[in-house]
């Protein structure tokens, strides 16, 4: 299977899915490689955060999605480090060009006291399942949205995106 997301990705004939986009999706998100993440996004994404107490967007533009996830109030915060690990997965083929990936997920987060990343201020980890939506465009699978459902959180997960250095700076 090709690991390149800029060319056509080999797909499973039964599910129409691509493991490469799912793996790369999380690799890029955890590494905060914004350019690579942007390259695998569909033009429009379905983003449903209602089961975690947030909003739902039926048609969020890729640019708006990138602005949201890379913002200092979220994953773009230089004091927040994260790693998203995928566990068990199954694929649901909706059509020739649409697939839903059902993923078991653990997202580990650490917030540091400053951007030098020397002192950990707090930790917060989440255990969840996640529906990921994929669409095939010109023979290439693109990430087209997500719908997480948290099972439980560890430590101070609720404070991860509120407790960082940059958030303290904004409140001063």
UniProtKB/Swiss-Prot annotation:
Keywords: Lyase. InterPro entries: NTF2-like_dom_sf, Scytalone_dehydratase, Scytalone_dh. GO terms for molecular function: scytalone dehydratase activity. Its EC number is 4.2.1.-. GO terms for biological process: melanin metabolic process. Substrate binds at residues 49, 130. SUPFAM superfamilies: NTF2-like. The active site is at 84, 109. It comes from the Eukaryota. The keyword NAD does not apply. Belongs to the scytalone dehydratase family. Homotrimer. Each subunit contains an active site, located in the central part of the hydrophobic core of the monomer, which functions independently. Scytalone dehydratase-like protein; part of the Pks2 gene cluster that mediates the formation of infectious structures (appressoria), enabling these fungi to kill insects faster. The product of the Pks2 gene cluster is different from the one of Pks1 and has still not been identified. This is Scytalone dehydratase-like protein Arp1. It comes from Metarhizium guizhouense (strain ARSEF 977). The gene is Arp1.
């Amino acid at each position: 299977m090709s690991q390149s997301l800029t060319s056509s990705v080999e797909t499973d004939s039964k599910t129409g899915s691509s493991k490469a986009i799912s793996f790369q999706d999380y690799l890029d998100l955890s590494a905060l490689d914004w350019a690579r993440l942007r390259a695998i996004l569909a033009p429009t994404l379905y983003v449903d955060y209602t089961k975690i107490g947030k909003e739902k967007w039926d048609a969020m533009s890729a640019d708006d999605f990138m602005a949201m996830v890379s913002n200092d109030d979220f994953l773009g915060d230089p004091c927040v480090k994260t790693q998203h690990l995928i566990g068990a997965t199954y694929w649901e083929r909706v059509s020739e060009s649409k697939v839903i990936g059902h993923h078991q997920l653990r997202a580990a987060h650490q917030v540091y006291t400053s951007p030098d990343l020397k002192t950990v201020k707090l930790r917060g980890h989440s255990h969840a399942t996640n529906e990921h939506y994929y669409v095939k465009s010109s023979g290439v699978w693109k990430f087209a949205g997500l719908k997480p459902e948290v099972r439980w959180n560890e430590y101070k997960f609720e404070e991860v995106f509120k407790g960082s250095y940059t958030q303290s700076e904004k409140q001063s």
